[in-house]
Amino acid sequence: MFRGANAISLDAKGRLAMPSRYRDELISRSSGQLIITIDAVDPCLCVYPLDEWELIETKLRALPSLREENRRLQRLLIGNAVDLELDGSGRFLVPPRLREYAKLDKRAMLVGQLNKFQLWDEDAWDAVSAADLAAIQQPGAMPDELRDLIL
């Protein structure tokens, strides 16, 4: 499971180093093979270990293809998915087109989301985090299914 927000840097070629605390799990689970694609909701990228991505593909494949909403989601997620592999230094290259989508420059945030990571531009992450915190603190903003969650 992947947790926490990690400040990272992209080099001039668009490579980033996976934080060392995640590398062993990624190597044992998927031999360091990753899939990166766009997030269809937020202006960031999603990075999946290959085994997790294969579960997503199975679910996407099972969606009825006659529904435009399903085809749209399949096009966005699968059409933008790129196979990656951690190199010997634990780095991977974020393709230019995906860097442009997420507006990634030098400073970024790699955010653990249990089964995947989100990769954000640092300023965008700071802004969405502040907005999320403000929104959830509003009276009545907590959904019913979260009210019973003990943190």
From Swiss-Prot:
All residue ranges annotated as the SpoVT-AbrB domain in the record: 5-52, 81-124
Major localization listed first in the record, in broad terms: cytoplasm
Keyword Transit peptide found: no
GO cellular component, one term: nucleoid
One MF annotation (Gene Ontology) recorded for this entry: transcription cis-regulatory region binding
Annotated keywords: Cytoplasm, DNA-binding, Repeat, Transcription, Transcription regulation
Tree of life domain: Bacteria
The keyword Repeat belongs to this UniProt entry's keyword annotation: yes
Record CDD domains: MraZ_C (cd16321), MraZ_N (cd16320)
Annotated GO biological process: negative regulation of DNA-templated transcription initiation
InterPro entries in the cross-refs: MraZ, MraZ_C, MraZ_dom, MraZ_N, MraZ_sf, SpoVT-AbrB_dom, SpoVT-AbrB_sf
Protein location: Cytoplasm, Nucleoid
Assembly behavior: Forms oligomers.
Family note: Belongs to the MraZ family.
Name of the featured protein: Transcriptional regulator MraZ
